[in-house]
Amino acid sequence: MSGHSKWHNIQKTKGAADAKRSAAFTKIAKEIIVAVKEGGGSGDPANNSRLATVIAKAKAVNMPNDNIKRTIDKALGAGNTENFEAVTYEGYGPGGVAVIVDALTDNRQRTAPEVRHAFDKCNGNLGAQGCVSWSFDRKGVIVIDNEDQELDEDTVMMDALEAGAADFEADGMVMEVRCEPDDFNTVVKALEDKGYTFLSADIAMVPQNYISLTDEGDLKNMQKLIDMLEDNDDVQNVWH
């Protein structure tokens, strides 16, 4: 089983948005630098699809355009010597919840023990590469804010499908749009042009199945594990 609660994952985005915004900006800035370098040194999102994806993610958390531009300029600068390596860790949290951790690090010897410590501390188990990734699908995921309940579900669904989305679900204050990764930037732009406000927009690892944690100890440990991992400066994403 892959995750512990689908809508918990989405609703949690709202609660954490303000408290962790500064940390999110720092982590996204790191992703922008990597995207520019791995995109052949291009700072133009029209010619660098990975950069376009990261910019969509940045805008969803209200990262100011000046910050985005400044980070791109920094990545393009001849004096920029920052080198980050993408590393993925996989394991199981309390109750058998599958967890994937994406990191960008300049020192594997620092990051790996810290990630392992988080799993051990929270009654989890860091596993081998591939131990849980088979139970996730890589998808574009866009979460639309409907806190004021003013959006019409059918209208949003039609707009999303016309934009190229593959799936749509709604639950109270949020609506989730899914698409294939190759369609992500097109769908994001189409929905932005319609005036929708995003809570998050990212290429995500989506669990194929979800489980419910009923034990209070498991619930507390799972939340603690997520918090410990997300508070780590090297960790970019925690999928569960």
Regions found by a protein language model. Name each.
Residues M1-G127, V132-V141, H240:
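N-terminal cationic and glycine-rich segments that engage phosphates or anionic surfaces
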